[in-house]
Amino acid sequence: LAPFPSCAITQFSAKPDLAAQVDVPAGFELETEAVRGQSCRYRTTSPLTLWPVKLESARLTGLPFTAPVNTLANGAVAVLRLVFTTLNPDVKFSQLGMDRLRLFLRGGQAAALQLYELLAAHTLGVALADTPGDLAPVLLPASAVQEVGFAPEEALLPWPARSFEGFRLLSEYFAFPQKFMFLDLAGLGAKTLVQESNRLEVFLYLDRTSAELERGVDANMFALGCTPMVNLFAQRCEPVALDHTTTEYRVLPDARRASVTEVWSVSSLREVRQDGTSPVSYTHLRAHETVLDL
């Protein structure tokens, strides 16, 4: 069985004078600070769009609440109000062209999971407005709140196509549930593209609430600019001398860091002869490949 590598959520911070988005691709490599002379290499597993905005405040309010009238959210018993501002007050939302924003739900695990369920399963609709009394809000359906982390391209671990994708999701969830604590707010461009202000209010109308969350939800429960990362990377291992004295040979990733590196999987294997030629490429025992010598 392959060991499960170290995982974490990393947060990127935008410079205050930034006036445009910054795209961080999946697979972006990071290195930790050295501990006892050794650092760890990580790579991000999902693409990230970093926006020069911050969450000014967040509040969950039950009935009676003050919010724009939303005809798509009849029967709402609570509303989550999120207030965003640009890092630079001189930058307007209309200059950014922001259509989607990713939120990471953090804090105590029990509260974060409860809030995730509330937003993912009990949102009736969304309103984008200037203030709670805005008479002309932009209304979005509940589908504007989207779960993140379940797509194959967002996998923490490389996964063979022959294996059921659900097993990977279960492995990742039980080993690192924080990977799935992300939600996207989509369709924001309907408001932000014409928002000549550095302030934007987002209202999520809910058909259920929690007295405990109403007391505890604030801006600290959300984080922007976050993405999962995993301590897993490709590397050519040290050559193995075949002396035919044993049936097992140790695969050593890096002789200089033997105590802090570990093999997760072997993706390819080639024979190299003394003259430097490499006539044979070995396939995996379970590979569906046939080599014909014609």
Residues covered by each model-derived region:
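Conserved small/polar residues in nucleotide/adenosyl-binding loops
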Residues: 283-290
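Extended assembly-interface regions of large multimeric machines
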Residues: 1-133, 137-142, 147-149
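Intrinsically disordered, low-complexity boundary segments flanking structured domains
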Residues: 1, 66-70, 113-114, 186-192, ...
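Extended, solvent-exposed segments with strong compositional bias
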Residues: 144-183
